[in-house]
Amino acid sequence: MSEHRIAMVGTPCEIMAASKLQHYTDSPIDVKLGLFCMENFSYKYFEHLLKEYDLKMDDIEKFQIDKGFVFLLLKTREIVKIPLSVAKRIIRKNCNICVELTSETSDISIGSIGSDDGWSTLIIRTEKGEEIVNGALEQKFIEAKELTDSRFNLLNKLAENKINKNLEEMKN
């Protein structure tokens, strides 16, 4: 066993690969923090898209997808709104066959779906994840409140939609 232990943050496909790695090698990965992910953009093509808006990666402070748009909060505090229909062309092709939204093989899943502004939704998936979250709460590094049933149902609905859409894509 490696003496160096690390925590890994990744999308569902990256977390799934890390989970498999833990079973077959002397993996240093001790904790897996999985992000919610509908799809991911190719970095190279995202840079090209930004050029169309006279922007660079370094200009962006925050990135958010909401209500059919990609919102870019720039360091200048300006907001750039790109229609998701335009951004769809730079989605990584392998995302069209991924059926995972919430990083189910992680210790803790994290995302904005179901969250109020300034908050993140956490799903604790393992004992290790529970220890980490409880420790962070005790140390007052984070605050927590329960996710309402309606917001939890929204998360489940979006996860189901992703599964159904991408299973259909795999048939074609």
Language-model region placement:
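Long, compositionally biased charged/polar accessory segments in the mid-to-C-terminal portions
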Residues: D54-N172
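Gly/Ser/Thr-rich loops at beta-strand to alpha-helix junctions
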Residues: M8-A18, E39
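Short, charged, surface-exposed secondary-structure boundary motifs
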Residues: E39-L49
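Short, solvent-exposed amphipathic alpha-helical segments in soluble enzyme
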Residues: Q22-D26, L49-K51, L137-I142
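Short glycine-/acidic-enriched loop or helix-start segments at secondary-structure transitions
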Residues: A17-K20, V133-N134
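A short alpha->loop->secondary-structure connector
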Residues: H23-L35
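Short active-site oxyanion
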Residues: E3-A7
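Disulfide-bonded cysteines in secreted/extracellular proteins and peptides
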Residues: C13, C37, C95-C98
